Curated annotation (Swiss-Prot):
Name listed for the protein in its UniProt record: Starch-binding protein SusD
Any one cellular-component term (Gene Ontology): outer membrane
A Pfam family per the record: SusD_RagB
Homology family: Belongs to the SusD family.
GO biological process: starch catabolic process; starch metabolic process
Top-level taxonomy: Bacteria, Pseudomonadati, Bacteroidota, Bacteroidia, Bacteroidales
Stimuli inducing this protein: By maltose.
S-diacylglycerol cysteine: lipidated positions: C25
Gene3D superfamilies, per database record: 1.25.40.390, SusD-like, Tetratricopeptide repeat domain
Length: 551
């Protein structure tokens, strides 16, 4: 029963907020006040679940038609898709095939501006969600029953998480703690960092013990892991590092009831909310269901966006052919790209006889270009890449970004169950998104120990052991660490943050294909380590100032 708790409540939650009279505006974060006497009674359970649902849905009617955010592309404006795009598309992990799409070239080349719409989408989404959290907290102020106290702690956690995204992406936030028409004030750097830290400390006692919460709700381990993430990045956010606390809180998570999943791929399959092996690692998932939570963000984006028609075992009837691996990502598993299993140039792809998964598999197997061949060649179960002929002949790298087969396909996210049973929908995935998982604590502790001059090999090798990696690390280097973050967490919506922390996102310390718009990569101005405050909010909120470097 616990595993389905959040999904069962989603339907009611999707209508709870609008029926309460909440509105939003694309051009600023002004909101209309709620009068519970005219807007209907406060549905505490519905609004509470909506607080979690906003992580994975975009409105009140599923795919589209009644969006949270008026005036925006509903499919593009969800929490996960907007944060994912800003943290993945500019990095060494992936490319977007269709460079003519709005603002995509700017993300690819790290050249965005305050007028970029995709920057505005994530900014407004984070602000909208915080508005809903403030509404819930105002409505439940003074209530002292145990369940309400726990719900309030969880909503405060989600609000702190959103403020962390503001801090990480923008270096500041339009800050409010109450639901009102007052303009948000600017809170940035150390001040915002301290606020998030204090919030997490204050709410910890009222949260579930690790692994005691219904699957999909935040517990103390989620709190500790967000704190570990905050402390690991303290040098970026405040100018003062705090690796000792990062190590301390990562160790608390590792010492809790969570355990590593023994099969890496099962973490990203459609039954990761029922398969105990996967669930034991997933600390906080974004709940997804092919029937109840249909949307164009979330795991639909991750599965459909990485597939093209003709690929074997797509897991969806709708391949969008959008996201593929950069060569730099492939190099995390193959330092020499000549070792990547690829179809020889002199082998023609048959024009007939490749109509079924079985036929494509047979051809791929004959030439050693299946995903299982990739894993074997890499000596690492995490190398979930596809170089076969399903959907066309692929390249490893390209001199012009013109289509989906300009790089290897990433098949990490799947709409297949580990037990072989059917999924709930042929197009929209059931796959939950592990927003927080235990492996992050291992790499956080490894990096924190390394930064303090200690031996970090144990934690890295623990993850490599799980991945059946044939190469164990003997000596940890900074490059080995940043590469390991990619091997473990590629396409999970965090890469930019790691690169910024390592001083590699904008500098020539590390170049990758198409960084800065150059085929072989080039450095960019350091102010791109932060996103700009959207010009719309600068114009509408006199309290907000633009980040340095942007005009």
């Amino acid at each position: 029963m616990k595993t389905k708790y959040i999904k069962q409540l989603f339907s009611a939650a999707l209508i709870a907020v609008l029926s309460s009279g909440v509105t939003s505006c694309i051009n600023d974060l002004d909101i209309s006040p709620i009068d519970p006497q005219t807007g209907g009674s406060f549905d505490q359970q519905g609004v509470f679940v909506k607080g979690y649902a906003m992580l994975g849905v975009t409105g009140q009617k599923g795919i589209d038609g009644s969006p949270d955010l008026d005036g925006q592309d509903e499919g593009e404006s969800g929490f996960y898709r907007t944060t994912f795009n800003c943290n993945e598309l500019p990095t060494d992990e992936c490319l977007w095939a269709w460079q003519e799409n709005q603002d995509i070239p700017q993300l690819t080349s790290i050249s965005w501006s305050p007028s970029s719409q995709r920057t505005e989408w994530v900014y407004v989404r984070l602000g909208y969600d915080i508005t809903q959290y403030n509404f819930f907290l105002d409505q439940t102020e003074g209530m002292t029953d145990a369940e309400t106290l726990r719900q309030r702690a969880e909503i405060r956690f989600l609000r702190a998480l959103h403020y962390w995204y503001f801090l990480d992406l923008f270096g500041k936030a339009p800050f409010k703690e109450h639901f009102s028409n007052d303009l948000p004030v600017e809170k940035k750097g150390t001040e915002l960092y301290t606020y998030i830290q204090n919030e997490l400390n204050e709410i910890e006692a009222d949260m579930y013990e690790p692994r005691q919460a219904p699957f999909g709700r935040a517990d103390k381990a989620a709190n500790w892991l967000l704190r570990a993430r905050l402390y690991l990045n303290a040098g970026v956010y405040t100018g003062q590092t705090d690796y000792a606390k990062a190590e301390e809180y990562a160790s608390k998570v590792i010492g809790s009831a969570y355990k590593l999943c023994t099969n890496y791929s099962e973490l990203f399959m459609a039954d990761n909310d029922e398969n105990e092996n996967a669930m034991q690692e997933i600390i906080l998932p974004i709940r997804q269901d092919g029937v109840k939570t249909r949307n164009y963000g979330g795991s639909t984006y991750l599965v459909c966006g990485t597939r093209v028609a003709g690929m074997p075992r797509m897991g969806t009837t709708n391949g969008w052919s959008c996201i593929f691996a950069r060569a730099a990502m492939v190099q995390k598993f193959f330092s020499n790209l000549e070792d990547v299993p690829m179809l020889p140039a002199d082998v023609e792809i048959p024009t007939k006889g490749l109509d079924t998964d079985e036929q494509i598999d047979a051809f791929d197997a004959e030439h050693g270009i299946r995903t299982e061949d990739m894993i074997k060649a890499a000596g690492d179960d995490r190398a979930l890449l596809y170089s076969g002929v399903g959907g066309g002949r692929r390249k490893i790298q390209t001199d012009a970004i013109s289509g989906f087969t300009d790089g290897l396909s990433i098949v990490k996210w799947q709409n297949y169950r580990s037990d072989g049973k059917p999924v709930s929908h042929a197009t929209y995935p059931d796959t939950d998104i592990p927003l927080f998982r235990l492996a992050e604590a291992y790499l956080t502790r490894a990096e924190a120990i390394f930064r303090q001059g200690g031996d970090a090999t144990g934690d890295i090798n623990e993850l490599r052991k799980r991945a059946n990696c044939t190469r164990k690390v003997q000596t940890v280097t900074e490059q080995e660490l940043i590469d390991e973050w990619a091997r473990e967490f590629y396409l999970e919506g965090r890469r930019r943050s790691d690169l910024v922390r390592f001083g590699m996102f904008t500098t020539n310390k590390y170049l990758w294909d198409w960084k800065g718009g150059a085929m072989n990569g080039t450095s960019v101005a350091s102010y791109y380590n932060k996103y700009p405050i959207p010009v719309s909010d600068i114009n509408n909120n006199r309290n907000m100032s633009q980040n340095e470097g942007y005009k």
